[in-house]
Design a protein with these regions (language model features):
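Catalytic active-site module of serine/aspartate enzymes centered on a nucleophile-bearing elbow/loop
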Residues: 105-139
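Active-site phosphate/pyrophosphate- and oxyanion-stabilizing loops and adjacent acidic/basic residues
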Residues: 71-72, 99-100, 126
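Conserved alpha/beta-hydrolase "acid-adjacent" motif
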Residues: 90-97
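Flexible "cap/lid" loop of the alpha/beta hydrolase fold
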Residues: 1-15
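Conserved alpha/beta-hydrolase catalytic His-Asp/Glu region
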Residues: 11-75
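Acidic beta-to-alpha connecting loop that harbors the catalytic carboxylate
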Residues: 87-90, 115-117
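Short beta-strand/loop motif that positions the catalytic acidic residue
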Residues: 77, 83-85, 89
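Active-site acidic short loop of glycosyltransferases
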Residues: 78-79, 107
């Protein structure tokens, strides 16, 4: 992804991290589509509360780790690997991450969660858990 995206995140965190968290979690869960259906307002608020309680310094310092280039490392993975991601991920689009990751890891199994946002472990837990259990049975 373009490095300017991460610079923008850092600027937003410095300017008003609480406002940043509010916007971030809207896209983390795709609340415009899934709020009240697959995620509750309380679950979103609980995540916001955890983020708001985190160190401002740590929140800012973790952003550069999000764009570390691990592509060379992925080509050396030699264990069974499941890559699972939502096709509606607004935080890290599947074309920029999951699809590429699955191609770089030899023999990786790709599972795409239809209409899944970034936090598929919450919004699509049954499907994610089913995929994980099936993968582990075969691994």
């Amino acid at each position: 992804m373009d490095g300017s995206v991460f610079e923008g995140i850092q600027k937003a965190l410095v300017a008003d991290r609480y406002a940043f968290f509010t916007e971030f979690f809207k896209n983390f869960y795709n609340t415009d589509l899934l709020l009240g259906k697959r995620v509750s307002e309380q679950a979103v608020q609980a995540n916001w509360n955890i983020s708001a309680g985190a160190s401002a310094t740590a929140c800012l310092a973790c952003v550069p780790t999000w764009h570390e280039d691990f592509r060379n490392d992925l080509t050396r993975v030699d264990v069974p690997t499941l890559v699972i991601q939502g096709d509606a991920d607004r935080i890290l689009p599947i074309t920029a991450s999951g699809l590429r990751t699955a191609k770089l890891i030899k023999g990786a199994r790709l599972s795409v969660v239809k209409d899944g946002p970034h936090c598929i472990t919450w919004t699509h837990a049954e499907q994610v858990n089913g995929e994980l259990l099936e993968f582990l049975r075969k691994a």
